[in-house]
Amino acid sequence: MYVLMCPCIQDPGLRARGITRESDLRAFEKALRRCRECGLDVVFLPCPETLFLGRDREPGTFLERLNTGDFFHLLDRLERDVKDIIRARGPPLCIVGVNSSPACGVDTTYYGDDGKGPARRAGRGVFLARFPTIPAVDVTDFCRYRIYLAAPLFSAAERRYNAHLRDILTAHFFLVFLPQEAGDDSSHRDEESQQAIFSRCCREIAESDIIVAVIDGADADSGTSWEMGYAYARGIPVVALRTDFRRAGMHEHVNLMLEQSSRVVRNEEELLQALKAPSVLRAGKLEVK
């Protein structure tokens, strides 16, 4: 399996002058690390802006710098080159793009002021728009792949379901920390063991990108609730999975403090969508001509 990736993620010097922040560089590095750690090959796309305007260029919108016949001819050639890659290798898992880019934006692009909308508007950049049936993910979403799976683990059924969830997430190229596989699976623990488990779990939460919490039952597990609160206090997003059809009230799926501090989903498909797993974002069949 492979991804098509914007080349500036590997070489930020391809970007316009002065737009790259430290947070961008961290996201770029983590996106590349995800591919290495999850066994994804990377095929880098060409950079239309650099090929057309050169390096060390001033920032500009599509309408300001790229809206010319010569640029569209360049896009035609690059599109053919990319489709040759797809024909040889098969469809990619996704394209990893960079939001706001005039050419390679995913959710937003600097199109320019045409009197019909804001200069920065929703939609793909002009190059990624040439591949509408390939799912595209912004690098700041793709780089969030380390998951802490918070869930009750006291019964065999709970542990089996936790392992089932871990396997699903791993199959979608996430790295998952499962506390029951790190020693937190027994009631026979001395004080030293308890402290070691607590410290390990706190550290793993702090190093995670997202918490996935299982909150089934008449009342959510107390340990899971604490892990959710700890993550929320640290600014780590929490996605809460509640497959239980019982509700806490007329307007609440579960305790409001848990619901307001997380995104609650009802099944595994919604969980993968909330995590922006590339394989569930497919829009249709890719036609390579």
For the regions a language model picked out, list residue spans one by one.
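Short Gly/Thr/Asp-enriched flexible loops that form oxyanion-binding sites at enzyme active sites
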Residues: S100, C104-F131, G223-Y232
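Conserved catalytic or regulatory cores that recognize and/or transform ribose-phosphate-containing ligands
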Residues: I134-K289
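Short connector loops at secondary-structure junctions
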Residues: L40-P59, D141-F142, F177-D185
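Divalent-metal-activated hydrolytic enzyme cores
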Residues: L53-I86, K116-Y145
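Extreme N-terminal starter segment of soluble prokaryotic enzymes
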Residues: M1-V3, Y145-R146
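N-terminal glycine-rich phosphate/adenylate-binding segment common to multiple enzyme folds
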Residues: D81-D113
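Short catalytic helix/loop segments, enriched in acidic residues and glycine
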Residues: R21-G39, L165-T170
